[in-house]
Every structure is written in structure tokens, then in C-alpha cells.
């Protein structure tokens, strides 16, 4: 669904657009006044099939051309999240590391992200 249709249905709710690793999609998201831009997958993940990985270069490009918050997604865990924050990601979307972690409970997994 495009963002214009989503806005009609959801009114003033927060709406984001996943742009994968595409500068073109980032520009479209900005033009369509999205509330946040998601970029990824940055790392291997079992959550979704990923055709190609997102790059730090794309994250930095998005940060350079917009003030819209950037959410990074895909395979983020305790050993790689800092690289994304150091490169100006506003938010981290972390799922499998927390909920499907075979070594740590969700609470302990979250605590390792400090």
C-alpha cells in the first residue's frame, strides 16, 4: 500500500517506509512525507529472505539528505548494533536476537545491548 492510501486510513498515526538499500526509495519516502525510513537488512537474518544487504553508505546518504528518523533493520544483535549507532541510525529494530535467542532470555538479550 502506498503512503497516501495509508494516511487516508490511519490519519495521524506513525507510518514508515522500508527502503531496503535504495537511494531512489529513500527519496520517494522523503517526498511522500513518511514519519520514518527503515533501511536494511544490514546483516544476515532468518526473519525474512533478503536479496541484498544494506550498506552503511546508504545509511549515511539518508542521514545527509533528511532529518526524518532512520530505523535500521535486519540481523541486528549485541555484536553489531554499535556500528549502526555510530553511523547515526536513530532507531534499531531488533527482533530475532531478542525473541529467538537460544542462549539468552529476552530480558538478558536486551541488557546486553547497553
Short names for language-model regions:
Residues 1-5, 38-50, 81-113:
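Glycine-rich phosphate-binding active-site loops on the catalytic face of alpha/beta enzymes
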Residues 1-22, 50-78, 111-114:
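Alpha-helix-loop-beta-strand connector modules within alpha/beta enzyme cores
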Residues 16, 20-48:
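Histidine/lysine/aspartate-rich catalytic loop segments that bind and position anionic ligands
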Residues 32, 65, 86-89:
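Structural motif
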Residues 35, 69, 90:
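Residue-level detector of anion-binding/catalytic polar loops
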Residues 28, 62, 83:
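Hydrophobic/aromatic ligand-binding patch that stacks against planar heteroaromatic rings
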Residues 32, 36, 75-83:
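Electropositive, surface-exposed helix/loop patches at the edges of structured domains
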Amino acid at each position: 500500500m502506498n503512503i497516501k492510501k495509508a494516511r487516508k486510513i490511519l490519519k495521524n498515526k506513525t507510518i514508515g517506509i522500508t527502503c531496503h538499500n535504495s537511494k531512489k526509495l529513500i527519496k520517494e519516502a522523503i517526498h511522500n512525507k513518511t514519519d520514518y525510513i527503515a533501511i536494511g537488512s544490514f546483516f544476515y537474518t532468518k526473519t525474512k529472505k533478503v536479496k541484498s544487504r544494506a550498506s552503511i553508505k546508504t545509511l549515511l546518504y539518508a542521514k545527509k539528505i533528511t532529518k526524518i528518523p532512520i530505523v535500521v533493520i535486519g540481523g541486528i544483535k549485541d555484536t553489531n548494533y554499535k556500528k549502526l549507532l555510530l553511523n547515526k541510525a536513530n532507531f534499531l529494530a531488533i527482533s530475532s536476537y531478542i525473541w529467538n535467542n537460544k542462549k539468552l532470555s529476552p530480558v538478558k538479550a536486551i541488557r546486553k545491548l547497553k
